[in-house]
Amino acid sequence: MANASEPGGGGSGGGAEAAALGLRLATLSLLLCVSLAGNVLFALLIVRERSLHRAPYYLLLDLCLADGLRALACLPAVMLAARRAAAAAGTPPGALGCKLLAFLAALFCFHAAFLLLGVGVTRYLAIAHHRFYAERLAGWPCAAMLVCAAWALALAAAFPPVLDGGGADDEDAPCALEQRPDGAPGALGFLLLLAAVVGATHLVYLRLLFFIHDRRKMRPARLVPAVSHDWTFHGPGATGQAAANWTAGFGRGPTPPALVGIRPAGPGRGARRLLVLEEFKTEKRLCKMFYAITLLFLLLWGPYVVASYLRVLVRPGAVPQAYLTASVWLTFAQAGINPVVCFLFNRELRDCFRAQFPCCQSPQATQATLPCDLKGIGL
């Protein structure tokens, strides 16, 4: 009776393992397809749409391409390693392959962290110092410099082999980030660097939030009469609108007394130096989108960074296998979540997507946009 029951138990166990392997491979394939489709679609949208040829979208283009390359390089290797581990005579992945994949994972992780820090700084300058941002940082040279700096810093942070490939016992992440036993101080230093970069990014956005909140405080109006000898108004009671119009290049007549020695802006590139309300709303929407990407990066990479800290400071077996598996899968999901966040938080991207792909727009939405188009041409 005992001999008769053993094959049945082995068959049921083998079926459960096969089902778990199939579910794991299907999930990895879905993540790979979603990441490649979303990131490539947004990259093509940014390249084809001329209204998106601005510095923030160039940085978003680099982030999308990096996420797509990470999914294309790492997820198929994890799928292959999972199949090898589940095979009866499966061989563990080679040490060189694991080191290469661990280097790529660290490279893309540090690249995203450094790039998001640069994006946070540019977002702060775009709102707090808009004139300096519009004159110096709004073009593609600044975006190219930030992209090159992010890749160079990421390469410098990921190249030393203190972050090695994991062992063959981790079926879900056989080639994920793991410190070497003899490289614990170096691994701790790089983990501290990653935490410092992510923390600095959130501090920049916190400073931006305080800046916006301070500018929204209501102050009581002081009704002091303004001084006027011609069309210009100056003095304590003046609102400054005439001087602002004259400085921006829209005023006519003599120079206001308070602006003697200042030349008005001409019709060239420096004519639009004031942050009007619509531009301010656009910059705020971009800030919300990039901060959502930064926050998701922290939430999805945070559990694995905590596990890495425990492995470095305590011992490799101090982290439960279930927690390690869940944290690794969260890092896999980060490669395909950014296009979804961009589509949800950026109305300009949604409008450009509907314009480039009219087949994705419903007839009701097309009819709803018709009066707006007629209103835009003056009918």
Swiss-Prot record:
Disulfide bonding pattern of the chain: C98-C175
Gene Ontology molecular function terms on file: G protein-coupled receptor activity
Record localization: Cell membrane
GO biological process, one term: positive regulation of insulin secretion involved in cellular response to glucose stimulus
TM region positions: 27-47, 59-79, 101-121, 143-163, 186-206, 290-310, 325-345
GO cellular component terms given for this protein: plasma membrane
Extracellular side: 1-26, 80-100, 164-185, 311-324
Positions annotated with a glycan in the UniProt record: N3
Main location: membrane
Residues in compartment: Cytoplasmic: 48-58, 122-142, 207-289, 346-379
Keywords: Cell membrane, Disulfide bond, G-protein coupled receptor, Glycoprotein, Membrane, Receptor, Transducer, Transmembrane, Transmembrane helix
Membrane topology (UniProt): Multi-pass membrane protein
Sequence similarity: Belongs to the G-protein coupled receptor 1 family.
Function description: Orphan receptor. Possible candidate for amine-like G-protein coupled receptor.
Protein's UniProt name: Probable G-protein coupled receptor 27
